[in-house]
Amino acid sequence: MKRADLSHPRVFNDPEWAEGYYKRNAKDIERVGKRFVKLLRNSGFESGRILDTGCGFGAVAIELAKEFPDIEIAGIDLGEPLLQLGQSLAGKAGVADRIAFSKGDVHELDFESNSFDVVVNTFMVHIVDAPVSMLNEMERVAKNQGRIMITDLRRMWLGLIVRKLRTAFTLEEGMEIIRKSDLRQGKYSKGPFWWDYMVGT
């Protein structure tokens, strides 16, 4: 199946569109957050600094903050309406004091090298202009013994029914992007609609 063009902008600057995106996708992304929590717990993680690259409305960051009280999270995104929504949702969840949302480009992270214990990325590889550049930046800011957690949609036959799956990469295409990047050795896996690449979990 040929990869389709995105049906939405790469950067969500329209407040109404951002609100609609949240309503359509909140539950799915919250489930990713819960899955990341489980993986981190199983790997022995308890505290530290986490960076959510392309955090959107903050669903993953909020799930992590709720489950790990001794962490600090930085969430970056270029979409200001999504960041504002994330701040509001974090406040309602009682974790706004531990998540710092800010506008930032995943291709040029404004953080020092070797500065985060965990770097996460959710459904962004197929959206950004230069995924290899984004992954290289994630590797740069992750600590030498840090964890890197990536999940993205997977193009497969269900894309005939679910259009957003047609815009994603296949598992093989995703792994080729990983191989072209500076990311350290990790583990590949796939779920019904997604693929994962995990380092240190």
Give the location of each predicted region.
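Class I SAM-dependent methyltransferase SAM/SAH-binding core
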Residues: 51, 57-108
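Conserved class I S-adenosyl-L-methionine
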Residues: 1-44
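C-terminal alpha-helical "lid/dimerization" subdomain adjacent to the S-adenosyl-L-methionine
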Residues: 4, 149-200
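A conserved beta-strand element that flanks and buttresses the S-adenosyl-L-methionine
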Residues: 120
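Short catalytic micro-motifs in class I SAM-dependent methyltransferases
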Residues: 123-124
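A short glycine-rich, Lys/Arg-flanked "PGG" loop and its adjoining helix->strand segment in the class I
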Residues: 132-144
